[in-house]
């Protein structure tokens, strides 16, 4: 059992039961800070932006600091983001902050808010993490919805400075709540632990024979 195994393609089953994604990001940021972690492809083809392990780690810690300034461990945060790296940074930020992420697609224009409101009620979310555009859009178009007004909104976009936070994370802790589409009824949430994510990632790595040199799309 060794965290460095994640850098040398020597990952053991025990490693995946012991460490979390935040542990892996931290060691990669320390040992390979300039290596690309994620690339966002606009329309699935053209590169729009990329982020290194070092940049992602620092962004996530700063976002976590902002989150914990306005929340407590174990609270649930609705995550309203379009596809892109802002979501990735906020997701890792929620992990480091020890809060439970609740990813939700933003509603399209003129589309009913019923699904989102159902998820807010079921998850008992108290926070919303989002971009400046979505934050402004919600408050412009849905300012009369009291339950949305009661949520604490945090715009993570552009958070580059401020206190950092890194909480203690255990593999059995809930990392996120994953909800069904709700197309055939009320959306139902599934609790996903940090261990679930690590084990699933390892299964994928083994199945596709990925190595530290692999690039996944």
Predicted region positions:
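Flexible, low-complexity linker/hinge segments
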Residues: 10-19, 114, 147, 151-174, ...
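Short, well-ordered beta-strand segments
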Residues: 75-80, 95, 175, 215-217
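A short N-terminal helical cap/helix-turn-helix that marks the beginning
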Residues: 16-39, 58, 175
């Amino acid at each position: 059992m060794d965290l460095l195994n994640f850098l040398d393609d020597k990952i053991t089953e025990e490693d995946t039961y012991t460490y979390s994604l935040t542990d892996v990001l931290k060691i990669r940021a320390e040992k390979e800070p300039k290596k690309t972690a994620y690339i966002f492809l606009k329309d699935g083809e053209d590169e729009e932006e990329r982020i290194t392990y070092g940049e992602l780690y620092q962004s996530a810690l700063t976002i976590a600091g902002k989150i914990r300034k306005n929340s407590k461990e174990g609270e649930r945060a609705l995550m309203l983001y379009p596809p892109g790296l802002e979501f990735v940074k906020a997701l890792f930020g929620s992990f480091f902050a020890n809060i439970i992420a609740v990813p939700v697609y933003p509603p399209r224009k003129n589309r009913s808010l019923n699904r989102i409101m159902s998820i807010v009620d079921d998850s008992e979310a108290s926070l919303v993490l989002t971009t400046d555009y979505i934050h402004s859009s919600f408050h412009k178009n849905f300012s009369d919805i009291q339950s949305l007004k009661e949520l604490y909104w945090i715009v993570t976009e552009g958070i580059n400075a401020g206190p950092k936070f890194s909480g203690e994370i255990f593999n059995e802790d809930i990392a996120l709540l994953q909800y069904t589409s709700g197309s055939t009824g009320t959306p139902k949430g599934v609790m996903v632990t940090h261990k679930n994510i690590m084990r699933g990632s390892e299964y994928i790595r083994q199945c596709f024979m990925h190595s530290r040199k692999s690039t996944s799309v």
